[in-house]
Amino acid sequence: FKGTPKFSSVFIQLNGVYKETNWDEEFKASREVGIDTWIIQYAEGFNDRTNEKSSFYSPTNLPWVTKQYDIMNRMFDAAERNGMKLIVGLYPGDYSKEDTTKPEQYEFLVERNKQVFDELFALWGNHPSLAGWYITEEFHDGSYPVGWQQEPALSMLANYLQTVAAYVKSKSPKEVCIAPALWRGMPADLCGKWFGKIFAQTPDIDVLYLQDIGGRCLVDFDVD
C-alpha cells in the first residue's frame, strides 16, 4: 500500500461467526492500509426480538444475557499485541418507533447502558488499547417513522445521551462517541441547527461519526 490513508477507523458489528476469528491477522491487515482503530458497534447482540440474548464479552452477570462469547476478550488481547485501538459500543438498544416523547424507553436504555458499561469498564477500563466508548442507539434529524425535530422529544433525546455520557465520564476519561444519521431529507442548514441544539445539551459527547446515510434524501420527501 503506497497511497495516503483516507480512513483511520472502521466499525464492526459482532455476531457469533467471529468466535474463531484470528484478530492478529485482521489487525495487521488494517494497519497496513492505515486503519488503527476499530469501533465495536455493540457489546451484545442486537436481538431483543428473539429469546436469545448474546454477550460478546465474558464474563457477564447481566440477568438478560443467555449466551456468552469471548470475542471482545480476544480482540483486546490482539489489539495490544498489534498497537490497535478499540472504541467499545455499549448496550444495543433502540428508541421508540411510535412515540419519542415517552420517558419510559429512555429510562430503560439509561439503566441498561449503565449496567453494560460497568462490566466493560471493570474488564478493560484501564486497558492500553481502549480508545473510547460508543452510545449505540442511532437517531436522525428526520421524521421517519417518528423523530425528534420538535420539543419535548429533542430535549428528551439530548438528556438521554448526556445522562449516559456523563455516567461514562464519571468513571472513564476516554472519549464518548455517537453516530447518528445526518440530513434525512432536511435542508443542510436546518440539519445543522438541529444538531446544534442537541450538542448544546450534551457537553460530555466528544465525537460524532458520519454514518453512511449522511446526505441521503428520499426519506421524508422525494427530491429530483
Residue ranges and their predicted role:
Residues 1-224:
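Glycan-processing catalytic domains of CAZymes
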